[in-house]
Amino acid sequence: ITLLANHPWFNITSLAASSRSAGKKYEDAVGKKWCMDTEIPEKVKDMIVRDATADIDKITAEVDFVFCAVDMKKDEIKKLEEEYAKHECPVVSNNSAHRFTPDVPMVVPELNADHIKIIPSQRKRLGTKRGFIAVKSNCSLQSYVPALFPLHDKFGVKDVLVCTYQAISG
């Protein structure tokens, strides 16, 4: 939310979550779970959170695409993201649920933007014209793989030892 709230390319028009948070102001839904150094952005703090499942028709009618980052079981996430795609709404997912789905591209744009070429195959499976799901890589990978990629291309990297320490975000 903090990265998108004042971004020049995006306008947050809807926020959705589980039925537990639906109907609440975003500020109230987040409550004490807000862990950022900054305050909840003014643009979104008073927005009413919608039910991501029950309000799918309304949400997909109002948005161009969805950024999905939900705390649910993997099978529930898969179902939810596929429903949005089937409603002809592109989904860019932060979740791991579809990272091993063969026709869902895991995109690190600087490295493998061409992986989006699999989307027509996914659309055929889902029966969609516009809707699709694309996922981002694990947060750890996206920090060091862009630096390793050109080194591998130039010199051939055989082994890498990586240590990660999880942040509050998971």
Predicted stretch roles:
Residues 1-170:
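N-terminal Rossmann-like NAD(P) cofactor-binding subdomain of oxidoreductases
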